[in-house]
A protein has these predicted regions:
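Short, Gly/Pro- and small/polar-rich lid/capping loops
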Residues: 5-26
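Short, compact, well-ordered microdomains
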Residues: 78-109
Length: 109
């Protein structure tokens, strides 16, 4: 089903993307805030590590990035994650022996 009128042309404004305009997305800071498991992180992360998601994500464990990405996208495009303060999202890495807890938050510039 299409939103196009009978002429096949969409009304003005309907072609705009939803969410924040490209280049205007907020910066996201990702911090390791806790470790629940007994073993050291295989990537070397520890509580207190802080990363700028856009600049430093190559320095972060790929598993933590993979888990955090949906939450970061939610924050970037104006959504909220249930059970978290607005502008923040907590998630855990999937390594069962480590279980680092990460906090993603919007950085006001």
């Amino acid at each position: 089903m299409s939103n196009a009128g009978e002429s096949g042309v969409k009304p003005a404004g309907e072609n705009r993307p939803l969410g924040a305009p490209r280049g205007k997305r907020p910066r996201i800071r990702v911090s390791c805030v806790d470790q629940l498991g007994a073993c050291r992180c295989h990537h070397g992360h520890k509580s207190g590590d802080v990363f700028d998601f856009d600049r430093d994500r190559g320095k972060m464990c790929a598993m933590a990035c993979h888990v955090g990405f949906p939450y970061i996208d939610i924050l970037r495009y104006g959504g909220t994650v249930p059970g978290n303060e607005p502008g923040t999202a907590k998630f855990c890495c999937p390594e069962v022996d480590t279980l680092n807890v990460w906090l993603a938050e919007i950085v006001d510039e």
